[in-house]
Design a protein with these regions (language model features):
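C-terminal regulatory/oligomerization modules of transcriptional regulators
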Residues: 103-134
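Conserved segment of winged-helix/HTH DNA-binding domains
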Residues: 73-98
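Glycine-centered, phosphate/nucleic-acid-interacting loop/turn motifs that mediate DNA/RNA or nucleotide
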Residues: 55
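Short acidic, hydrophobic short linear motifs in intrinsically disordered regions
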Residues: 25-34
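Short capping segments at the starts of secondary-structure elements
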Residues: 18-26
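Short, hydrophobic-biased segments on the C-terminal half of alpha helices
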Residues: 45-49
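Hydrophobic residues on short alpha-helical segments
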Residues: 13-19, 98
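Short, cationic-aromatic polyanion-contact patches
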Residues: 5-11, 62-81
Length: 134
């Protein structure tokens, strides 16, 4: 069964992106990686507490501060988001989604062939995606 997650705001997604990239982090470390203009420390602290109530993160206490870590893997949330996008805007049709992006991005035949190759053989690395450390 697929997981269903609560809706995330843009700010919540930005904090999750930092946590997925960095791993367990303190609020001050997250602040340094958020796009400018950086929100206030208290704002980020509030966002991670909201993410905690939504079940996306948890924390370890270190004295009076907390180090936050993810509970929802990025790939799992990515799948959920894509399914929601497909269902809400493309009638659950992957071909409609690909057709839309092909038109929007003016993809040429070689790019479409590469996309089809990746769809047929998901183990082929995507040259545009950073390699994750083992």
């Amino acid at each position: 069964m697929d997981n269903v997650f609560p809706e995330l705001t843009r700010a919540e997604e930005q904090v999750m992106q930092v946590l997925w990239r960095r791993g367990p982090s303190f609020v001050k470390d997250m602040l340094a990686e958020l796009p400018a203009p950086a929100p206030a420390y208290n704002t980020v602290s509030t966002i991670v507490r909201i993410l905690e109530t939504k079940g996306f993160v948890d924390h370890e206490a270190f004295g009076r501060t907390h180090r936050y870590f993810v509970l929802v893997p990025q790939d799992e949330y990515r799948r959920f988001s894509l399914r929601k996008l497909l269902g809400g805007h493309f009638g659950n049709s992957f071909s409609r989604l690909v057709s839309f992006f092909a038109k929007e991005e003016n993809l040429d035949a070689a790019q479409l062939d590469e996309l089809l190759r990746h769809a047929a053989h998901p183990s082929i690395p995507n040259p545009d995606e950073p390699i994750q450390p083992a």
